[in-house]
Amino acid sequence: MEFVKNAGNSDEALWSFWACKETAYKVIKKTFPDVAFLPRRWPVTFDKSKSKKSDGLVKVPDKGDIYIHLFSNPDYIHCVGVDELSALDKIICDVENLPAGKTDPSLFSRLCLAQSLAKSFSLNLHQIKIKRTRTKGELQPPRVYIDGRKTDIDISLSHDGCFVAYAVTFLNKKNSIL
């Protein structure tokens, strides 16, 4: 926590560490569904340069390393991660402003992701669905369906306050993203 104490903006530094640890948890959980979130045991190192994007690493004992990109600006902090370093630069991600009004942030984040996928694949937006299913009564992570068929496209969706975010990669299952 010395880094947080000595940071020019301690709030940003603290939230950056937290975002990195949450990202690592979401990535690890895809491979190890029963993993517990133990953030105090997960050291984070990153190159906190003056740029808006920093690279880093979260070490999850007995599970592996998570490689991260941390994006920060005065309005938000956003972190994406993978379990294979070679996949880190293959992530497509974005942060969007949630429209004013009674917009459901979960639905809006899915719409933003679907629009990005439609553009990437030259598809009609209506061909793409983002769904969550239940297994043994528990909601599973969202999955991408194209023309009604489940894909292996790895995605992550999030929302907080007036922002929504998504991350996607088109790699195999081992190369998980956030």
Segments (PLM) and residue ranges:
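Core catalytic alpha/beta fold that binds nucleotide/phospho-ligands
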Residues: 1-178
